[in-house]
A protein has these predicted regions:
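A short helix-loop-beta-strand connector motif used in the catalytic cores of GNAT acetyltransferases and
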Residues: 28, 34-54, 66, 123, ...
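Active-site/acyl-donor-binding loops of N-acyltransferases
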Residues: 116-135, 232-279
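Conserved GNAT acetyl-CoA-binding A-motif
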Residues: 93-105, 226-237
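Amide-forming acyltransferase catalytic core, primarily the GNAT-like/NAT-type
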Residues: 94, 118-200
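Conserved beta-strand in the GNAT
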Residues: 45, 51-59, 66-71, 186-195, ...
């Protein structure tokens, strides 16, 4: 089988969206436009001869990289296409100076990624509330543009990579919401949420592990602004925030396993993912 891999172009977006949504990912062209704005040439199209059969995405954060979407047409699976795309993305990230690559794997794909050198870390629950009830809580300070550098440094200390390009794209978008808590000019935790007309995704959140009270206050502040929406978030299965989300009406849709190729990058903290695609 003759594979060709090239960067995903705008003319490929219709195929990419159609293929991605065979996985019930509810993606749109805007998702690939957003990925391209963050990581030009980080989205890939795989062709078998002249036929497009697969896509993959990845993003670099300095020494940390993240592998995101991987989809192969059903009739082209188990023929090496998936391995070819993952290997191509790994090489791309290595050339960008990435030392550690993370991803979130569905349980059935853990053996596949293990064969490619990834090692399982911990499991994360994908939570969903289809109609969030109103929550009353004390509002917290919104993250301002002048706070961004401090937020990026705080985030990097725990995540391990510099997510400035991602964080500023979320935090500075007026449609989204965010807040942080500081003490003596030191950030203790922050959260951001991407908000759509009828849905929202809470994350990223990073908070010092010894301050679950701060993390709870951050989440409640964001939840208070999302009433009646479909709300999603992804948490470690042993998260200090699990009880809060379950009591707010969230339930687990499915779980994934975080895996790393290279040294595990994250430090102990209270954590919500930004997305399954970007870490």
């Amino acid at each position: 089988m003759m594979f060709e891999i090239k960067p995903l172009c705008k003319s490929d977006y219709d195929f990419a969206v159609e293929l991605a949504n065979t996985m019930d990912w509810h993606m749109a062209a805007e998702d690939f436009i957003f990925m391209d704005s963050l990581e030009p040439e980080g989205c890939f199209l795989l062709r078998d001869d002249t036929n497009p059969v697969g896509i993959a995405t990845c993003i670099s954060y300095g020494k940390i990289g993240w592998f995101g979407n991987l989809v192969i047409r059903k009739e082209s699976r188990k023929k090496g296409a998936g391995s070819a795309l993952v290997s191509h993305a790994i090489n791309y990230l290595r050339q960008k100076g990435v030392e550690t690559i993370g991803l979130y794997a569905y349980p059935y794909l853990v053996p596949f990624y293990t064969k490619l050198g990834f090692r399982s870390n911990i499991n994360f629950s994908v939570l969903h509330n289809p109609n969030l009830s109103p929550i009353s809580t004390k509002p917290l300070p919104t993250i301002k543009k002048s706070d961004l550098l401090s937020i990026v440094r705080f985030d990097q200390a725990f995540f391990g990579g510099n997510r400035k390009k991602l964080l500023q794209s979320i935090i500075l978008d007026p449609n989204n919401t965010s807040c942080c808590i500081s003490q003596d000019d030191q950030i203790l935790g922050y959260v951001a949420a991407t908000v759509y007309e009828k849905a929202a995704w809470i994350g990223p959140l990073i908070c010092q592990s010894q301050r679950p009270d701060i993390a709870v206050a951050l989440v409640n502040s964001v939840l208070s602004k999302l009433a009646t929406k479909h709300v999603y978030t992804v948490i470690p299965q042993d998260s200090a925030l699990a009880e809060l989300f379950f009591s707010a009406g969230f339930s687990e849709d499915f779980f994934v396993t975080r895996m790393f190729l290279g040294q595990t990058s994250t430090k102990n903290c209270i954590y919500l993912t930004e997305s399954l695609e970007r870490g």
